[in-house]
Structure formats: C-alpha cells, structure tokens
C-alpha cells in the first residue's frame, strides 16, 4: 500500500527558510539527516500541523492536511499521527499508565500486531507505570512517549531523535524493537536523527537537509556511504581521549589513543578528523549548540 507524502512550500525562520518540494512514498521508512539548525524538527512540525504559517501544501495518502493558499487545514489531533520529539513530551499531572491509557482510548481501530504488555515490557516501562510523568528521567520519558505513540496505532509515525536520552544499550534494543514492530504494524515512518547507524537500521530512503533546503535525496545506504567516503577523503580519523574540560574557558585537553572511539566527555573517547602524531599539541574548543527545537 502506498503512503504518499507531499510537502510543497516555504516557512521563514530567523536562521533559515524551510523551502520544500517533496513527494515521497513513506511506506519505505524515510530518514531525515542534517546538522543542528538545518530544519529537521521544523519539517516534522510542518507535517504534524504545528506550523500554521507554512505557506504551502501538505498531503498524505491523497488527503490535504494543510493548504496555506486557502487557509485550510486539518487539526493535528485529526491526522492520526504518532509523534515523539526529543524531549519525550508527556501529559503533565498524569502517571505513565494514564498517559498510555490516553493513547489507547484514541487509538485507531486496527488489528494490533504488538500488544500493550509486549510494548511496556520491551520498553522497560512496567516498573514506571505508577510514576508521575514529572519524575521520569529523559530516557524514561522518551520510552514512555514512544510507547504512547505506538499504542495510538498511528497512520504515520514521526520520530525526532527519540532515543537520544537513552544509554547505548537501551538505544540498540529500541532500534531492534522498532525495526521489528513497524513493519508488523504496517506503520509508515519519518525518522529524524544525527546518528547514521540509527538511520541505516531503521530507514530505507533518506533526505539530507541544509539550512532548510534538501541537499540530497536517495537510498539511505547509498547516501550514508557517500557521506562516509567524503569524510574519509578529507582526513584520516585519529582517536583521542578527553582528559579534562574547562567549560568556563570552553577548552578541552585531549590525549591520542589509536584504539579509541566514542563521545567527547572527560575520560571518554572521540574521533578527530585531523592528521596528527604522538607529539602533536592537541586542544579542542567547546561550542554550545542551538536548541534543535529552533530548527
């Protein structure tokens, strides 16, 4: 079955203008890749109907969701969406169980391939069901929000960095579950992530955004391989360990480690795209990143 998503139009922002002319069948899961501020979150907000100023048209499966020329739009809650943003937004003042029940009450009437019990068990939520949403950690909120979105049995699932607050083990488990569940449920997916390995495992086609404009579009594995080769031509990766950081001075001290790979935190490892030797003086500048919700 085709799930054709059409987005044509513009939305002006302070740092970029989202300028889109997309026509894709999201029956094959679609990934969105781009730097912070490229417009990835804004694109998902346009699909979800959260950007009323979008001067264009959004269609899904032949249904017009937004027509800026005629000031016509279908409200977000009537689009049959499952949406998870990076902050894992839940209904305040309710327990996890109440949040999940809210989704079940409004779920589409379809045959479910994955049960409530299977979801809460696999997402490690059973011990949290009686907890208020406000006391959850970032990773717990994301998992609860993901369960709620799936329990709504959506027509289209929009995920924006939905695993970022979870540890590596949880992330890999969640990727495996999503890769199994979504085809079983027949749920089309639009997935935003900075993580190439997540996109490689969960999506089949990819759009690369740069300052609000599509700079590349094609098969996920082809575009990711091309990106990897381009980085490799620029420089040979050199691994190092971050020994200390000075946030006030925005500096970090690194030590080369040829077996290392990982994240730039004290005592952790980071890959550097520079040609270096053991005698190289090495430093790094820390730069605060803008809020992804702004782009």
PLM feature segments, named:
Residues 211-212:
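Conserved ABC ATPase "signature" C-loop
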Residues 151-155:
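A short, proline-enriched helix->beta-strand linker immediately N-terminal to the Walker B motif
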Residues 186-194:
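Conserved H-loop
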Residues 65-82, 106:
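ABC ATPase NBD coupling module
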Residues 63-67, 111-128, 179-180:
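Conserved ABC ATPase "signature" region
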Residues 132-136, 140:
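Conserved ABC ATPase signature
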């Amino acid at each position: 079955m085709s799930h054709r998503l059409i987005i044509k139009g513009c939305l002006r922002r302070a740092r970029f203008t989202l300028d889109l002319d997309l026509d894709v069948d999201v029956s094959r899961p679609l990934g969105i890749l781009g730097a912070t501020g490229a417009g990835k979150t804004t694109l998902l907000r346009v699909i979800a109907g959260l950007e009323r100023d979008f001067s264009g048209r959004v269609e899904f499966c032949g249904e017009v969701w937004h027509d800026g020329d005629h000031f016509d739009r279908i409200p977000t809650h009537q689009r049959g969406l499952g949406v998870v943003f990076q902050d894992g937004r839940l209904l305040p003042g309710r327990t996890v169980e109440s949040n999940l029940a809210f989704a079940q009450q409004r779920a589409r009437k379809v045959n479910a391939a994955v049960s409530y019990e299977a979801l809460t068990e696999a997402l490690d939520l059973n011990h949290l069901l009686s907890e208020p949403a406000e006391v959850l950690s970032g990773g717990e909120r994301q998992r609860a929000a993901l369960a709620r979105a799936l329990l709504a049995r959506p027509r289209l699932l929009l995920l924006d960095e939905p695993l970022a607050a979870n540890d590596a083990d949880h992330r890999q488990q969640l990727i495996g579950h999503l890769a199994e569940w979504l085809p079983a449920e027949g749920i089309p997916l639009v997935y935003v992530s900075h993580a190439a390995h997540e996109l490689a495992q969960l999506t089949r086609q990819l759009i690369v955004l740069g300052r609000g404009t599509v700079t590349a579009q094609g098969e996920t594995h082809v575009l990711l391989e091309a990106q990897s080769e381009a980085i490799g031509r620029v420089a040979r990766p050199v691994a190092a360990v971050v020994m200390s950081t000075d946030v006030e001075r925005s500096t970090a001290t690194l030590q080369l480690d040829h077996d290392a790979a990982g994240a730039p935190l004290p005592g952790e490892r980071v890959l550097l795209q520079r040609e270096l030797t053991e005698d190289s003086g090495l430093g790094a500048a820390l730069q605060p990143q803008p809020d992804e919700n702004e782009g």
